[in-house]
Amino acid sequence: MTKRIAITPGEPASIGPDLVIKLAQQAWPVELVVCADPNLLMTRAKMLGLPLQLRPYQPSQPPKPQTAGTLTIAPFTLAEEVECGVLNEANSAYVVETLRYAGEKNMSNEFDAVVTGPVHKGIINQAGIPFSGHTEFFALQANCADVVMMLAAPGLQVALMTTHIPLAYVAKAITRDRLHHIITILHRELVSKFGLGSPKIYVCGLNPHAGEDGHLGREEIDTIIPALNELREQGMDIVGPLPADTLFQPKYLEQADVVLAMYHDQGLPVLKSLGFGKSVNITLGLPYIRTSVDHGTALELAGSGKADCGSFTCALNKAIELASKSK
């Protein structure tokens, strides 16, 4: 059965619309429902010199594979005309509304996944709309207490124990309860959405050399190791904690389905050095599939035709893959 994937281009003055139009230049085995202002897409396509036809979204009809040069449109209306590369807080509510719609329709199973383009958090907050990011927005909308951020690149998947918090707060944020919660979500999602029977999770230590038997920090001894042992007793296949400076090498990565890093800059620099532009942000713990690009708005490239749609293509391919596997 053909899947139906929602796409939100994100910030209208950014490269988001450009990338969606570039995606449309090839055929896809799914229906791509773009939540956007149709005039924005047609104007940007003309600017890029690329062919584009929009067909209206008809939820009562079965989804059809997307033919090259076409997109299915769920129409929204911008408050003001867009100038490429120029942020306008008047259009912030439009951006948030496209996200709200995509989330609602995924929760009602009208869509099989959502792929999100880059947004500009600053301009949304400047408009008086509290917004800390896609992940938090969708989690709040779906009433999810916790979600897990995971980035995937060819040959490596890295999930994060903590995300966007100062390094000084990381150690206190790593508790037995939180380790239980995050790893349980990670394990469950790898089974249900990735189709893995018994996922192997490799876990980084927090301290250099994973604490070196307590000489370089006791978090491993007092918190991480006891929590991992308790999770192993539940049948989870967990390796670690291992020193982060040695974990990211082929002899471990070839065995791992995912690496759990303790903090943002412990795991993501390695992943992005291996696959920047080819990595995908995946939110685990939502009641639906959400993938995203691994880059920002690149306002200076909007409308120029120079934006690379590699990450958006990877995000869409990953969403299609997960939608086909999801139980």
Curated annotation (Swiss-Prot):
Its main location: cytoplasm. GO terms for biological process: pyridoxal phosphate biosynthetic process; pyridoxine biosynthetic process. Substrate binds at H134, T135, K272, N281, R290. Its cofactor is Zn(2+); Mg(2+); Co(2+). The keyword Isomerase does not apply. Pathway: Cofactor biosynthesis; pyridoxine 5'-phosphate biosynthesis; pyridoxine 5'-phosphate from D-erythrose 4-phosphate: step 4/5. Its EC number is 1.1.1.262. It is an enzyme of class 1 (oxidoreductase). HAMAP family: PdxA (MF_00536). Catalyzes the NAD(P)-dependent oxidation of 4-(phosphooxy)-L-threonine (HTP) into 2-amino-3-oxo-4-(phosphooxy)butyric acid which spontaneously decarboxylates to form 3-amino-2-oxopropyl phosphate (AHAP). The active site is located at the dimer interface. This is 4-hydroxythreonine-4-phosphate dehydrogenase. It comes from Shewanella frigidimarina (strain NCIMB 400).
